[in-house]
Amino acid sequence: MDSHYGDIEGKDRAEEGLARQSLEIKVSSEPLTPANPVEQEPEPKPEPEPTQGREPESETQPVSDSSKAKDSEGIDYAHVEVPESPGAAETAGEAVSREPESLPQTQPKTKPESKEPEDKDEDEDEDEDEDEDEDEDEDEDEDEGEERDRPEKPKGKGKREKRKESRFRPSLPLTTIVEEGAAPGPQAAKEKARESLKKRDSEEIEGTDRERHKSTEEQLHPGEAKEEEKQKGASTEEFEWTADMQKLQEQQLRGELVEQYHSLLVERNRYQRYNMYLQQKIHETLRKKGLEAAAEPGDKSAEPESPEKEQAYLRYLAMLEELKKQEADDLEWYRQEVRELKQQCQEKQTRVEKEWRRFQALKKQVVMQVMGSCRTRGGRQAALREVEQLQALEDKKEKEMSAVRLENVQLKQSLVHFETRMKAQEDLAEGLLLIDFEQLKIENQTFNEKVEERNEELLKLRTKVTSNVQIITHVKEKLSFIDTENSCKKAQLSEVDAQVALGRDLLTKTKQARDSLRIDNVKLSQKCGLLGKESLLRDLEEKVEKTEMLNRRLESLKRHHAGLALSCKGVKQKIREAKTFLPS
């Protein structure tokens, strides 16, 4: 009966978790388009989603903030739809900028340390962060059914909640925020938180009464303590199952969040590059307008627009700085929340392990007492070994059961997710299913025609392939024949090369003999003179005859000249003598 009760209780807890996740899926499954505005969200989210609150701000965040973003791996990035264009980014920003208003909707709870005097605003913010962390931790404890000791409720709960709402409320007019749709969200969340707190108070009171009743019954009826211990063992077994399941769920969720974190980092870098590109375009346009204004001083139409544009630019810069500050505050708050949740999870795990060890020790003690009373064969050592084997087998079966239950819960969650998506698609496509069916039939016919055409083309290609295969085989045969012929030609070429080499050697030797004979011929021709040269000899004879004739003529001319010279001298003598006889 106890195990059956534990199974029913585990199923109820799984259904509560699935219902909570269905709310998140229902909100995130709606497309962020102008056709589906933000007012259509049916219910506010009970849990904060940090990514939706700061997705638009990450577009203008500098690159140096990436080191800060890496520290927040545990932040829930689920159900974030990144817009593909700047227009889609604006619409997504309109839808997402409303999410931080629903963050402080849960009822805060303070720790005993928060009773110290708050002197600074920073201390107050830290206390508020701790209150929010404890509140979310209490929601998880309600699902597990654990009983805890809680401090008293703080008196300034509403005041801190208002501060948290004012800190997360986007007060900047960057995007159009629909406040009418988000107005009833905090009230419903507050009512839900109050109901959960009342339920926890009643459970704690029942737990304390149950413990007192058990203590009194143990004092009055010590024999019934063993049965109660067995029931307690079954409940701790169920508690161990829920803790293992929660641990596996947290590990799986952490892996998914890390993957989403890396994908969002890539998107953030892309938007940063796009932001730099837009800033460069703005700079170029402003510079061009400045050059045009300097080139055309007479045109004063652009002068009244420049102050307005400067004011708008400064206003947007101030908005950007405020958004960055708000993002830094939100990031610090989420980091603090993650640290607190990790610490609480570690405490839960240690407490669960401690209780499980104590429960195993108690079972071991009870079994040893029972087996000792039965006086089993082998004595105490054999009984101890048998008990250890049974406990090891029990641990193995518990692990297998927890894994199977976790898989069952995951399948149920995926089923709910798909059902919500199908319902959303049916709501969107209501009234258009018949038209879609007709269009699909037409498309199916066109696709069938295309398939037939493709089949015909495939047959043609197959015939071409067969013909090409035959051609390739023929070419291969011809290639092999040409290879053999080429090898024969290469052998012949090698023989011809050898003959050419021998001929070259003979040619060099004959050239050397020719050169030597030519030199000898030149020497002999120099020695023999005009021997064997008839033309030269004839010419020489003619020249000799001409020289002899010219020499004879020269001798005759010399004699004639000498006779003329003697006659001239005689004439001159006669003239001189005649002059002497002439009278002066």
Curated annotation (Swiss-Prot):
Q: Where is this protein chiefly located?
A: other
**Does the keyword section mention Coiled coil?**
yes
Coiled-coil region(s) at which residues?
Answer: 317-470, 530-561
Its localization reads: Cell projection, Cilium; Cytoplasm, Cytoskeleton, Microtubule organizing center, Centrosome
Q: Where is the composition biased (Basic and acidic residues)?
A: 1-18, 42-57, 67-82, 189-232
Q: What does this protein do?
A: In complex with CFAP263, acts as a regulator of ciliary beating that connects radial spoke 3 (RS3) to the inner dynein arm (IDA) and the nexin-dynein regulatory complex (N-DRC). The complex is positioned parallel to N-DRC and forms a connection between the arch at the base of RS3, the IDA tail and N-DRC.
Protein name, entry field:
Cilia- and flagella-associated protein 184
Q: Which organism is it from?
A: Mus musculus (Mouse)
Gene expressing this chain: Cfap184
